[in-house]
């Protein structure tokens, strides 16, 4: 990669492009007892042409996606739905394919529907290597969420960014209200995270630093709510380089 072709990109974007970092919030479809049962039940459902929306599939998806929506990363959700990454449109294979089933909140599932295709598959693609997640400004000011492509402009990246923007800002009067609630939850999450970062940097007590480090590690792991925003907050600031050690290598 020739850096002169990417002048103006933040330091993290350049480091990703040059292979210095391997960041990914990549959800692994682990083989567990729950997923084995879900796959077996999906096979039966396919043969009987019955519903894929069954207990074992819901429980397995909840486990795989750490109980959070794969699109907005919100965990404070009361309504979840099974989402098809590639809209099945009646296609039996896509409809019952375990690898095509994702865990989504009702808000994001309704917004996505079959309007965004193709999009990145977070169980296969290093989403954070392709998209930067940033929150600019503060509440009461010109607060704005930014999703920007890192490196190659691909159709699935562009569509994913469009979906993220729609999910976080809403597309109808009702969805805009729901999106506002998601952004409020994100804001509170990031505020708490920033406080941990500040305390970690300021404390001189070794034991206290270890305790806060544990909290930071918890907030940056794959299962954390809004992990993408938190990781990019660290990656974008040189002063936080010490905290990068708590970001898991996937």
Tell where the protein language model's regions lie, with residue ranges.
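Domain-level detector of nuclease and nuclease-like folds
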Residues: 113-200
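Short hydrophobic targeting helices and cationic amphipathic motifs
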Residues: 3-9, 14, 127
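DNA major-groove recognition helix of helix-turn-helix/homeodomain DNA-binding modules
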Residues: 108
């Amino acid at each position: 990669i020739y850096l002169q072709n990417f002048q103006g990109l933040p330091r993290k974007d350049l480091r990703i492009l040059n292979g210095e970092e391997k960041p990914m919030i990549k959800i692994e479809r682990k083989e567990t007892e729950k997923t084995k049962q879900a796959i077996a039940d999906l096979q039966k459902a396919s043969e009987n042409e019955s519903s894929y929306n069954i207990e074992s599939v819901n429980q397995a998806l909840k486990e795989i996606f750490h109980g959070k929506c794969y699109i907005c990363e919100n965990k404070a959700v009361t309504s979840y739905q099974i989402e098809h990454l590639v809209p099945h449109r009646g296609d039996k294979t896509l409809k019952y394919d375990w690898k095509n089933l994702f865990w989504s909140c009702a808000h994001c599932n309704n917004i996505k529907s079959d309007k965004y295709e193709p999009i990145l598959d977070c169980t296969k693609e290093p989403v954070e290597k392709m998209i930067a997640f940033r929150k600019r400004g503060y509440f009461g000011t010109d607060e704005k969420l930014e999703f920007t492509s890192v490196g190659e402009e691909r159709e699935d990246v562009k569509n994913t960014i469009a979906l993220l923007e729609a999910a976080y800002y809403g597309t109808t009067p009702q969805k805009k209200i729901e999106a506002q609630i998601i952004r409020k939850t994100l804001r509170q999450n990031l505020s708490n995270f920033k406080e941990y970062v500040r305390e970690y940097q300021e404390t001189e007590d070794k034991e206290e630093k270890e305790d806060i480090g544990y909290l930071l590690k918890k907030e940056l792991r794959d299962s954390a709510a809004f992990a993408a925003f938190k990781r990019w907050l660290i990656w974008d600031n040189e002063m936080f380089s010490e905290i990068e050690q708590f970001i898991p290598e996937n």
